[in-house]
Amino acid sequence: MSTITAAEVNKLRTMTGAGMMDCKKALTESGGDFEAAIDILRKKGQKVSAARAENTTSEGIVSITVSADGKNGKLVALACETEPVSKVADFKNLSEAIMAVAVAKKPATTEELSALPLADGRTVQEHIIDLTGKIGEKVTITSYVSMDGEQVVPYIHSNGKLGVMVALKNTGGKDCSEAGRDVAMQAAAMKPVALDKDDVDPKTVEREIEIGKEQARAEGKPEAMLEKIALGKLNKFYKDATLLNQEFVKDNSKSISQMLDGFHKGLTVSAFVRISLS
């Protein structure tokens, strides 16, 4: 069995807010698997976010450009290893050039984007390789998303490392950017794992039910009641972790779905993406 280090224990504590000894026991039980350790903590009743703490070491720039008609948005995340590199001119210029060619050529995938030529004829990937050699850090496109909708609304957090795009539908031709920005900021802050209940990964649903049962069992609830209790906890998970069902942070008497419908009858979200470099 591998030895669990103090750094790993502290990392899990930072991710979950659980006590040091609880984190050590969970990591030991899981063999050092952080995702499994989080599930162990939750089964034992620890108040750990089901959405999972972000656990990346990337720095870089997340940029978004929306078309003039507001019906398409493109997000590009260009990552490096350290914050100082993300602020140098060569890195910023490459990020801007990649976005410009994405807007002009409309690639469907990251692979297609990487193969596109920039102004000097060399491809995006060749420029990335050159910059990696020049600065001594790995540079990579970690995310590229092209999103269509009746109205696409962007949000970039002030640190430039977190971006959200929201596609609205049933706008009725109305400018709904104000409501869309509220939704995008909600997604940035509350980290939903899916748009609505039906969009949650079935494996996640199964895991939440199992965790709910274990929590109820640990509380001494009768076996015959475990399924019902677990389904109740699952409904709370949906409320906490799916965007349309989350409480609106600006007015918790409403869900996001209700806020949108109040802004314009029938207004809703057809898609969203949240990308963070941290």
Curated annotation (Swiss-Prot):
Region: Involved in Mg(2+) ion dislocation from EF-Tu, residue numbers: 82-85
InterPro entries xref list: EF-Ts_dimer_sf, Transl_elong_EFTs/EF1B, Transl_elong_EFTs/EF1B_dimer, Transl_elong_Ts_CS, UBA-like_sf
GO cellular component, one term: cytoplasm
Principal subcellular localisation of the protein: cytoplasm
Keyword annotations: Cytoplasm, Elongation factor, Protein biosynthesis
CDD domains for the chain: UBA_EF-Ts (cd14275)
Keyword Cytoplasm (UniProt): yes
A Pfam family hit: EF_TS
GO molecular function: translation elongation factor activity
Localization annotation: Cytoplasm
Entry similarity comment: Belongs to the EF-Ts family.
Function field: Associates with the EF-Tu.GDP complex and induces the exchange of GDP to GTP. It remains bound to the aminoacyl-tRNA.EF-Tu.GTP complex up to the GTP hydrolysis stage on the ribosome.
Protein name: Elongation factor Ts
Source organism per UniProt: Cytophaga hutchinsonii (strain ATCC 33406 / DSM 1761 / CIP 103989 / NBRC 15051 / NCIMB 9469 / D465)
Source species taxonomy: Bacteria, Pseudomonadati, Bacteroidota, Cytophagia, Cytophagales
